[in-house]
Structure formats: C-alpha cells, structure tokens
Amino acid sequence: MRNVFGAPVLVASLVCASATCPELGCVSVPSDGMQPALATHVLDWRDEVIYQLITDRFADGDVNNDFTVEPGSLGKYQGGDWKGIEDHLDYLQALGVTTLWISPIVQNVDSDANIDAYHGYWQQDLTKLNPHMGDLASLRSMIAHAHDLGLKIVLDIVCNHMGQVFFYDINKNGQPDDYVNGSGGPGDPVVQVSEYDPPWAPGGVLSFSQEGSSGRAPIIFLNNPTINRMAGQPGILSTVGAYHGMGHILDFNDVTQRTLGDFTGGLKDLATELPEVRATLVDSFAKWVEKLDLDGYRIDTVKHVESSFWPVFANATRQRLAAEGKTNFLMFGEAFDGNDQLLGSFTQNDALDSVFYFSQAFQVYDGVFENASVGGQSGTDQIEGLWNQRIMNYATTVIPGGIGVPPSKALVNFIDNHDVPRFLFASNGDTDALHNALTLLLTEDGIPDIYYGTEQDFSGGNDPGNREILWLSNFNAQGDTFQHIAKLTGIRKASIALRRGDTTVRWSTPHVGTEIDAGIFAFERTGGDAPAPGYALVVLNTNPHQASSTTDGTNPMKVSVPPGTTTLTDVLD
C-alpha cells in the first residue's frame, strides 16, 4: 500500500456516526408454477456494493448441465451455473458485497466460429432460460436465498441486438456462405464476405449476381436447433422487419452506423425505433422480473440504440413494476466510451438511473492508479476535474418513479470488467496499486462495482483471458486483496458519510514526480441522511516512489472540521 506521511493510506472518520442498512425479510422459494410476490429490497442504491460475475465462470454447482463443457478452454462453456452461485453466497457475504450482477439468463445461439455464448450476449429466445445455467427452479432458489441473506440481484440484459439468428443471402443460393468477392484482376479489390456477418452497407446489405447488384439481400432465418441458431423470439423478433439489415459496423464513431449496424460477429441489430419491438423488449424482460423478483437491470450496449428509446423503455418498465409492488428498480447502462458527456446523455430526459462510469475507469483507474506502476501516470487533479463535470453531464434531479437518487449521485464506479484487461494485467501485477484503487472505489460517491476475481488477484488480459474460472481459487477468503476489500466494505457499511454523504475535494495535484505532494488526493465525505450524519476524510497517495504530503511546502491542506473539536481515527490502520 502507498504511504501517506509514512503511514498507511488514511480513511478516517469521526467515531463513525454510522447508520447501517437494516436487515430485510426472508423470501420463500416459489414452485415452478408460482410467481414470487414482488417486493422492494433496496432502500438506497448508494448503500449497495455490486459484484459482477459471469455465471459460467463463478461456480459449478450442478454437473448435470455441464454438456459441451471444455475445461480450461476459456472460449467455451466451463460449467458454472445458478446452483453454484447459491452454494457460495456465504463467500460473497464474507467479502461484504450486497448486490450480485449476474450475466444474461436467456437462451442464446450456443456457438459461432468455435466460440461459445457462455457470456450470454448472443440471445436467441427472450422467453426461455439458458439450459447451460440451470432451470427456473434453480434460478428462483438462488435468488430467493440471496434475498433471504439481504443480497440483491441485478440482471444483465440486451436491447440492442439478437445473436446470429439469420444470414444475408447475398448470392441468393438459399444457404449461408463465406466467399471471396472480386475477379482478382488488376486494381480489383478482393474482399472476403461472410453472409452471417457482412460489412456495413448504407442502404442495406445488397445481393449480387454476375451482372452486379440485384437489390437488398434476402434475410433468411436459420433453423439449427442443435446450437439454437434459429429465428429470434418472441413474436416480432422472428420477422425481417424487426431488424435493420445494414451489416456490421465499420466506423464506431459514425452515429448512424453505431445505432443501425449489426455488432461485429454477426449480432443482428434490432429496429428498436419500432413501437412493436420496444413493447416486446419491455414485456420480455419485465416478465423475468415478475418470475424472479429481480432488483435491477444492467443494460448492455446502450450507445448502439437510438437515444429516444431509453426514456420509453425505462419509464414503461418502472410503471409496470411499480404497479406490482416493485420500486427502486435500478437500471444502469453500459456505453463502452470515455466521452463523459455521451455517458451522461443516457441519464437525461428521465431515462436511465445510472451508467457504468467508463470515463472514470479510463481517466482515473487507468490514468492515475494503473499507470503509476507502468509509467505515464496522470496527476490526481484529473480526478477532481472529472468529478466536477458530473453536475454538467449527468442528470441532477430525481427521476420520477426511479431510484430516488439523482443519476449524478448514483454512477456505477468500477476499476475493470469483462471487456477490458484486468487491473493487475495492465499494472504488471502491482497489488499495492490495486489496493489503493479499491480504497477509492469503496469510498467515493456513487455505487461501487467489483468484478469477480479481483478479490483473488486475477490478472487476465483481453477477452477471454479476463474471464477466468473462479472456483480454481477454491474461494480463498484469506488472501490480502480479499481481506482488504472485506475491510473496506465493512467500513463503508458503518459510515453513512461514505455511502450517502456529499463530497468535497481537499487536495489534488498535477504533480507525479518528486514534488512534495506528488500523487496525493484527498477528499471529505460529509453528511448523509438525518438523524445521524457522518464525516469521513479519505487521503490517498498514488505515488509509487515516495511518501508524499498534503501540502505544497507552504500551504497545508484544510478540512471542514474545526480545530480541536474532533478526533479522527485511521480505520485502515
């Protein structure tokens, strides 16, 4: 751990005027034919600590659903399931997390190009469960027991696309082909084309004959039940009109391509501007909430859907669930982009409650903490600058029917995830830097999210290397990183200021060298909610080379607590 004044990183609070979250009631497990009564299990989402897991990689609790498993081949199913999650809820409690974000549950196109859909993002039928993960009874049992322990469940969903459910019959021979276009003559480009995944075409993917273009390529739905490569379901999702049919995106900076194009890999872009498609998506996912008593959605690829979709989808979902007794239902979106203004746009106009805070992941956790280990570190003034943009870029008022907290105060903070290399990969295994980053994650404003395996010092690189098998760790709860997280989650739980308080930056610096304050970042968390407001002072030294100080040599750091009135305790010491 980096040192401040030669002592451990300081997370100090005044004898913690604490307000911990009350225990919530038990939930019985309904039979397959019964739906659970919907209930609101969350008082304030800022009290939660999210743990993102890939079901297939977390724990294998039922070998009976281990068909097509190839142990150790990370592009293939490994056997994790919902029973495995249920069997290890005690592990998650010991870590101190309070909400589980589970990977998509619906039936997928099983395999493509020798890669399996273990992740869940190649959906084929929104009305059926993925049999690799278990059945309805095992999923309900896991969720009911999680709720019984005070754990909440966020479901990963996709509104942008379906899996590889059809092909473009470019050569009009009625079967999917991979072939080379071009005569091979001088100056004639040679292009390999897959009818499963052709490139973007502004007017739609075209068919060709020997005479040249012959109009829009017919869309032909597949019928291969052995790997679920069949027409999308339900209803309208099995019709040509439900898809844009433009081929895959070539330029992700082109808004038209980004919102109308297929996702690379043959993932078919839905015509989400159509009222019938919108209604189908709202209904299909809401039915799973009703069947399972889920507590929120993490929504994939939100920047690839037209912006007008999100207020409609979110508010229709809120109204439907509230009528059945489910409020404070969290919906946060994933837009893989460092543009803070773009991220914030998804919270405007009463749309999403929150987003995955990618701009912070890139600028802060990569730029400041990770790069401290490998060179090119940014100053901590970059953290303050980004935080100051929140009130400009994110909605600052409570969304009607939403979670009761403005999006600007409920951003989902994370260090890494399943789409980027793990922190320890990029930092060359620097666990001190990781622990420092985790300290910020669990004390800053917003909702912290921890990617599974972080607690076990996983260090995988790019996909699928960053989607390791957790049970190979034997669920060790004694490691330094596991214990560091557990201590921080306990501190957070005990301090209402760290969960709900206002934030004031007290020291940031552009210095990253040998200056006296190089790498220092300090902030206060104050208040929370009456009747027991709290106080916490967080001081971090991101400099890997020296014990820095909260001074520039002449001016010391000032805090809001009057001198002589308060005793601060180093709760990480």
Give the positions of each predicted feature.
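Bacterial lipoprotein signal-peptidase II cleavage site
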Residues: 27-32
